Amino acid sequence: IDTAEKAMEAGHYFRQADVDILFLYVTTYALSSTVLPVVQKAKVPVIILNLSPGASINYEQFNNMNDRTKMTGEWLAYCSACPVPEIANVFRRSGIKFHQVTGMLHDDKECWNEVGEWIEAAKVANVMAHNNLGAMGHYYSGMLDIYTDLTLQVATFGGHIEIMEVDELSSIRKQITPQQIDKRVKDFYEIFAINDECSLHELQRAARTSAALDELVKKYRLGSLAYYYKGTGNADNEDTMSSVILGNSLLTANGIPVAGEYEIKNAQAMKIMDSFGTGGSFTEYYAMDYADDVILMGHDGPGHIKIAEGKIKVRALQVYHGKVGKGLSVEMAVKHGPVTLLSVVERAEGKLMLLVAEGESIAGPILGIGNTNSRYKFSIGARKFVTDWNSHGPAHHCAVGIGHIGSKIEKLGALLNMEVVKVC
């Protein structure tokens, strides 16, 4: 593309192709007039690739060419850095956000890792823009921090939020066959480490609900789900809601993260983490261990099977913490090694931001209470981490995934025009 006319044609082509992101590879000197129309028409994020063909010019060989025309051509091959300030200037004056990758075309791992992260971030933004998030039931009464503006969620991430009723799940549950229940119980024994205290009756209850959840997810093409419902005074709904944990754990493991307590913000965070391929399990503070300088974090309800340290245990609980009824629950720790925490934070000024921290899941004693829980260590220490994290006003839930992906989340925030704060 070396004329303004070709640039306009390219811009129309990119719009028709419905691209999510543009990579502008500056190969040599280019007039900004051959670039601006492309980006103006495409109206998508642009990454300027300021890539040199090599680490340096062979000065001796260059100066021995004895042909000024050839010398100019060879110099221009290394001239990609020259027009980048011009292009950046025009983008800024045109109100176009841009990002840069500076490095070498070949043998530059750091550079191409960065390009790869931009591609991953664009993919996740696309997933979120097309995601159907189910919101089933109602908010946990009195838990003010988790309430959110649904319109703001869709305006920021895109996608669709389907408001759903527990009654429908209870209705589907009644249609599940004995054969479906038997098959799902067998699945449970293959996937989970089931404690002897778990009765066949409870396993069958959970299996019926799990199969019904699959039907509900299929009907609404859900990519994530937030749920909570007391079910008090309605035996069918109480039966449903006291037997959802195993089924929700299976959904979470299969790319449909499920957040309890109707935590829609955290369902979004979990979907982001899962779309990056790092898991995304529902978690909150459990306790501080000042002796070992670690934080215990976890939650009741579903866990993410694919990021568990070993096989997830299933335990029978005679009472649910803050929930109606009794039934089966899962107990797991997140795989030992690097982890990333993510919270979608709703700001007082009416915007969403992404709060991120990188740490380590470490071995050690945890609470055997039939919940997910792990021990986390942070580079800034447990005390400072908690203080700094809380200072940004997140809800008390967050999503945890394996690996350090803070830089990828920062790029996602840039693509979505969201503020990103990294605590550590």
Predicted regions and their residues:
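Long, internal scaffold/assembly segments composed of regular secondary structure
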Residues: 183-276
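Short, acidic/small-residue loops that bind anionic groups at enzyme active sites
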Residues: 37-64, 69-81, 248-261
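Short Gly/Thr/Asp-enriched flexible loops that form oxyanion-binding sites at enzyme active sites
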Residues: 30-43, 234-248, 378-381
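Short, well-structured alpha-helical segments in soluble
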Residues: 7-19, 35-38, 210-219
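Extended hydrophobic packing segments that form well-structured cores
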Residues: 323-424
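C-terminal catalytic subdomain
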Residues: 251-368
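Cap/lid and interdomain-hinge subdomains that line or gate substrate/regulatory clefts
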Residues: 55-185, 191-192, 198
